[in-house]
Structures are given as C-alpha cells and as structure tokens.
Design a protein with these regions (language model features):
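Carbohydrate transferase catalytic cores enriched for Leloir-type hexosyltransferases
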Residues: 1-188
Length: 188
C-alpha cells in the first residue's frame, strides 16, 4: 500500500504542529515495514529540515518537494477544491493531510490531523484579517477563514480524523458535527 503524507508543516519548527507531525511520521516509518510512503512538501520560502528527512529516507520513502505559495494551495484546495493531490505525488491509497490545506483526491482514502478548533472557539486569538505589506512583498492570510474552509472539507470528505486529545475529539463532534467513529485520538 502507498501512503502519502503532507509534511509541509515541518517548516514551523518548535511549534506543537511540527512536533506532532514529526513524531507521527517518525513512528510510522520506524514501525511500519510493509507500506511505501510519499512525503509531500510545499513552501514558497521555507526550507525543509533535511537532517530530519535524511534519517527517514529509504527505499520505501519518497519525498516530493514543491515551492507553491500557501495562499495558492489554500485557494486551489480549500476554496475551489480542485486539483487532486495525486496529480503532484502520484497514486496513493491513503493521503494524510496536516494543518493548512485539505486537497481532494482521485481515489485515495483521506485522513487528517486535527490539532484544535481555536478558529471556532476563540477566533479573536487567531489572525483573522488579510493583510499585504508591499514593501516586504508579504501577504498575511486570514487564518480563521482559511482554517474554516479546510475544516468544511474535513467534515464532508475525510474518512478518518486523528485528534491530538480527547478535548479536540469532543470539539470535533460538538462544533463540526463529525461522527465519533471517524475520530481517533492519538496523543502527541
């Protein structure tokens, strides 16, 4: 079986999202000796930590690196929800997304990681305005709206949601209305 995993969030070193994703990928690759893995990475400016990746590479692991801006992927996958992930990484049986986007798939089953629902519970604590700095050529997205778009697709299309805590699982049931059998708690 081929399993694809979005590892783009590994660029956010020192965050809980990065630590959880790194532990999940490391554990899967150390314990699973049967399946092949395709790791998808995309970032316009940030670089992948190759010291971590070099420890994971082997005959069963392939890394696909792209340099798409996160706003483009948000538009393509969260807003208009086109361009299946298989067009970039090839055929996979399962695709695990992480924190920023929820791509469609052609045939692959979908799983995702749900860290929290702060965009619903405390939107004022999250960046909730779109801004552009023409001097630095920096675009700062509205994280609240982007996450809500992603979570719409999570609720309606994803087959399995890995929650990082029991509280996140309960929030997913209560706030998003996701059925309990689709939710699995995997602690950090």
């Amino acid at each position: 079986m081929k399993i694809g995993i979005d590892i783009s969030q590994l660029t956010h070193q020192g965050t809980g999202v990065e630590k959880y994703l790194k532990n999940l990928v490391t554990t899967l690759l150390k314990t699973d000796k049967e399946n092949d893995y395709i790791l998808f990475f995309s970032s316009l400016r940030r670089k992948l930590d190759y010291s971590f990746i070099n420890k994971l590479t082997g005959s069963r692991v392939e890394i696909k690196i792209f340099h798409f801006p996160p706003l483009l992927l948000d538009f393509i996958w969260n807003r208009i929800h086109v361009f299946p992930i298989e067009y970039l990484i090839g055929n996979v049986d399962i695709f695990i997304s992480s924190d920023w986007t929820q791509p469609p798939t052609l045939k692959a089953k979908k799983a995702t990681i749900l860290y929290d629902l702060i965009v619903y519970k405390y939107p004022e604590e999250t960046h909730n305005k779109f801004s552009f700095n023409p001097i630095k050529l920096l675009v700062s997205p509205n994280i609240v709206e982007s996450q809500k778009r992603r979570l719409f697709w999570v609720k309606n299309e994803v087959d399995l949601v890995f929650c990082i805590s029991q509280a996140t699982k309960e929030d997913a049931k209560k706030i998003l209305g996701i059925e309990g059998q689709k939710l699995k708690v995997i602690y950090p």
